[in-house]
Amino acid sequence: MNKIRKLAALAVLPLVATLVALPAQAAERPSCPAPSKAEVRRSSADKVDKPARGATAIKGVRVDHIPKGFTYGQVIVNKHDGIVEYGYQWSDDRDDASRRHRALWVRVVCWPKATSLAQLKNAPFNIGSFSGDTTTTKVGDRRVLRQKGDGALGAGVYTGWVERPGVVVTVMASPPLVPGLTKIIKGIRL
């Protein structure tokens, strides 16, 4: 009888180990999507993807609504001042000055101090600060900071929100994409 109990206990061990390991793995997952070493190298080398990547272009982020018409894309990674900026920029072949130029930039910023929307106005981003006239709007369940794009970002609309403490998401859409910006924002999942 003892041998049968031992065998039964040994047979159950792999199942128990699997059940116990899953919650432990979930606890180890980073709360903010981080670029792989390969993505950091691609960004440093200014590698271009032709054709552009799809909904999972940013590891750990899903962009469910990407408008059509993009011909290339590029990973953008920037590490500075204790934060990591990680994003993807989709674009078409039109000149940047063209009013029909299509560009979309989705970025996740791992910034441990980020807890509220008001902090985005003084965020230490290298590109894309909320320094102009901003408005707060609601998109789905998210409170979003919005401003007109200018300067290095180009024309269009620049938006951002705190997804959860320490995680900021920003989206820059060129003028032809602005009518669908709400759908783009609603489709972003971390």
Named regions from a protein language model:
Residues 1-28:
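Secretory targeting and sorting signals
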Residues 29-156:
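Short, solvent-exposed recognition patches
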Residues 160-162:
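Feature captures outer-membrane beta-barrel proteins of Gram-negative bacteria and organelles
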Residues 165-190:
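Surface-exposed amphipathic alpha-helical segments
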